[in-house]
Amino acid sequence: QKKKLLAEGYDVLMVRDGKDVQLDNVARTVICNNVADCHIALHWDSDGLSYDKGCFYASVPEKLKKMRPVASYWEEHDALGKSLIKGLRSQKIKINGTGATEIDLTQTSYSTIPSVDIELGNQCSDHSDRKLQKLADGLVQGINKYVKHHIHVAPLSSL
């Protein structure tokens, strides 16, 4: 995923790229709020199921959408999640239901940038290199579409 994004011209900050990183969700959210244009947390669901339930993103629960700071940002979180799911669908990746599951997360409740937690499957999912490449391709496609339509960056010539 990181190499593919770098190849597309993105700057990528991996807040947690090893097993020994001890940053909690609040710390990760604060870091991303200060240095990133968007925050995407990639996970494999540890649901204990004996089957692959597919990918989904954690959408903001209805009961939180009017609370601050969530009210100002949830629509962008949702747009990012939908874009990622659309990219995964284009690669024929299994999607759980609509692709969105309401979950109250620190990350989306306190993020001041577009932010999404995406579950790429679970312990029963295919974790082969081929499948991981398809997941990465779908995510990059979703990120590209989201950035094109939602993140406005001034052209270098105007700086």
Task: Go through the PLM ranges and name each one.
Residues 1-159:
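Active-site-proximal helix/loop segments of hydrolytic enzymes
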